[in-house]
């Protein structure tokens, strides 16, 4: 008896809910076994890098919120650090603590969505519902600090837009007290679940060499056992003062990457707790008048202050000529911004390095030899968002 399987080509997406965006995947399969996976990108391309060249440094910030729209503040952070390096301005301590605090809240925001939607992709509904309750609380913190639940536009070259409103730190403290037990509930539900492990263990295995060769970063790299985290290896703002661990996996499969993301949330809680305990008093913006607009009280007294405010928001400020690359440890991996300034009020070039772009390239070799159903698991573990991939 012969076992002949038919070779088929399948278009997966871009309207499929499990592709996490507008991914079009062309799968070449023998029966249900995948031979090749060819991702087609560009369906969400908006020309972000070119648009930024026509905006002032202040007007460019909202574009970063719309790249990886699941973790917006981390991307603003990279751009702010790059602009600050060219400007050579001092950042107030309180602003640095606030930025680290919200970067870690953003990490939790990202990982809760990833783990919840990954569980949903393989057939578990409960984790998504539980984790979305926690995400809602963080989005309320976003709204209270910036006025927006998603596209916050909060970080600025020189600090942050506004100081924390009264009572917010206390509410964040309450949140991190009750959040770890909720994570423990998710772990009790998934970690030793037979079906969950069957769907994730030994699926999409990435060796240390492959992770390095393909330029992986974040949980995709640490899941393979490489302890590389920019918060430790190249600390920015006040990360050097924070006490936290870098979780790593050992097998490089989907299950290890899930565990790394779970453990990262516990570490984020530790960092947030330290930020709240050590939060200093003081200004949240640099005192350089070229970067910081005058207060409303000053504008009511002085015509020059009103003119200064108007010119700052219409013409922006000149950034000294030079080039810089700055990267942050975003929830998905290394998010980098390369800025080239010719001395004007607009960047001559702004190149964005998105971690998801490198991770999506690895989908082909990770999928080979797996079943069609496993491709869905691998897409989920890549944690891709097409805002940052297509830009």
Swiss-Prot record:
InterPro entries: NADH_Q_OxRdtase_suD (IPR001135), NADH_UbQ_OxRdtase_49kDa_CS (IPR014029), NDH1_su_D/H (IPR022885), NiFe-Hase_large (IPR029014). One of its GO terms (cellular component) is plasma membrane. Transmembrane segments: none annotated. It is an enzyme of class 7 (translocase). The keyword Transmembrane does not apply. It is a peripheral membrane protein. One of its GO terms (molecular function) is quinone binding. Keywords: Cell inner membrane, Cell membrane, Membrane, NAD, Quinone, Translocase, Transport, Ubiquinone. Pfam families: Complex1_49kDa. It is found in: Cell inner membrane. It catalyses: a quinone + NADH + 5 H(+)(in) = a quinol + NAD(+) + 4 H(+)(out). Its main location: membrane. Its EC number is 7.1.1.-. Belongs to the complex I 49 kDa subunit family. NCBIfam families: NuoD, PRK06075.1. NDH-1 shuttles electrons from NADH, via FMN and iron-sulfur (Fe-S) centers, to quinones in the respiratory chain. The immediate electron acceptor for the enzyme in this species is believed to be ubiquinone. Couples the redox reaction to proton translocation (for every two electrons transferred, four hydrogen ions are translocated across the cytoplasmic membrane), and thus conserves the redox energy in a proton gradient. HAMAP family: NDH1_NuoD. NDH-1 is composed of 14 different subunits. Subunits NuoB, C, D, E, F, and G constitute the peripheral sector of the complex. This is NADH-quinone oxidoreductase subunit D.
